Amino acid sequence: MIITSSSFERIKSVGMRKLDFAIIDPHIHQWDPYHTPHSAALLVKALGNYPRVMDKVVRFVKPKPLLDTLGLTEYALSPYLPQNYHEDMGHHRIESVVHVEANWHHHKGFGVVEETKWIQQLNFKDQNLKLGAIIATADPRDRKFKQILKAHQDASPLFRGIRKMASWHEDSGIYRWCDQAHLYQSKKFLKGFEQLAKMDLSFDAWTYSTQISEITKLAKQFPQTPIVVDHLATPAGLFGPIGKKTGQTPSQRAAIFQQWQRDLAVLAEQKNVYAKISGLMMPVLGHRFYQQYRTATVYEMVNLLTPLIQHAIQVFGPDRIIFASNFPMDKANTTLSDLIQAYIEMITPYGDQAMYSIFRQNAANFYQLN
């Protein structure tokens, strides 16, 4: 199968169904480069009033793989706070959110606990939103990993687990979000990882699709630890060229999809693993709507993403699939309102119970939301 929008049977009409319950969005990011540790803090404070100049400077000093992942720099350089998320919601009813670590600049040792403290004090209530849980970060390789986890617990009663990104693509033109390949199989990582089960904590795993087997091995080694795969393990280049050599031709993109299908099916055999349908409009997948100075329509997203959603639900079942927005990381190519609507349309054929599970109950179960 060749993965292009013209490859799929066209959906003749896209309805605008509304959900009769409030959504839980278990994957959002918050940041404020003006007031928190941030890799671009100095730049933002100096040039924040001159966005075009700031964009040019960022594109000069930051690595191209990172810029290709972001697509547009403005969303990463601008504050994204509860009021910004609320504005993006549109007409959808969202009751509760889960904050997932956002690459806090003080990322070593106990520095990561600063992010948990900062998120805990953000005012979601004024936006009629509830902060349901915090997924922080910590490095299982750290000698003080257990103490860092306890510090997160002390910082917030909403702390439920961690994410440690292991996204490392063999194509060096695709941004690497960790400092070593095969992180999830490193001896130091595995030794520290044991603490999560002992402390009743969950793990958000994020890799590229070429690394799914590493998550499978991790899940087998720790069957008592709940693991959720973020962004369906990001099949980079599935919808277009990215990096130096990935997704360059229709046949390459077809191979990416087929390998992703096989590996995800094997991963789904591990019953402690859930999967988030999220992050599927990030530029790293090959989407280039932002280069057309527009966002994808609901219709376009339904056509592009339906094969991924169908396969994920087929292998995991509707009780282990979790909707999440990943906002604002997908904002270069879509609005939050249209993204939610597209997922509603794609999940409607599975029935009302599946809709409730995917948009609400599964997240509540996984993250132990009160």
Q: In which residue ranges do the predicted regions lie?
A:
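Active-site gating/metal-coordination segments in enzymes
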Residues: I2-S7, F110-Q211, K217-K220, A233, ...
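Catalytic pocket-lining loop regions of alpha/beta-barrel enzymes
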Residues: Y34, S39, L47, Q180-I322, ...
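Mid-to-C-terminal alpha-helical segments outside catalytic/metal-binding sites
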Residues: M1-P26, H35-E87, S96, Q310-I322, ...
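Short, well-ordered coil/turn segments that N-cap beta-strands
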Residues: D20-A22, H92-V98, Q127-A133, A155-R160, ...
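Conserved, mostly hydrophobic/aromatic
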Residues: H27, V97, I134, I162, ...
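Active-site gating loops and adjacent loop-to-helix segments of metal-dependent hydrolytic enzymes
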Residues: D32-Q83, D88-S96, P157-H182, T225-P226, ...
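Alpha-helical packing segments of well-folded alpha/beta enzyme cores
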Residues: L81-D88, R93, E115, I148, ...
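Catalytic metal-binding/acid-base residues of hydrolase active sites
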Residues: H29, N103, D139, A233, ...
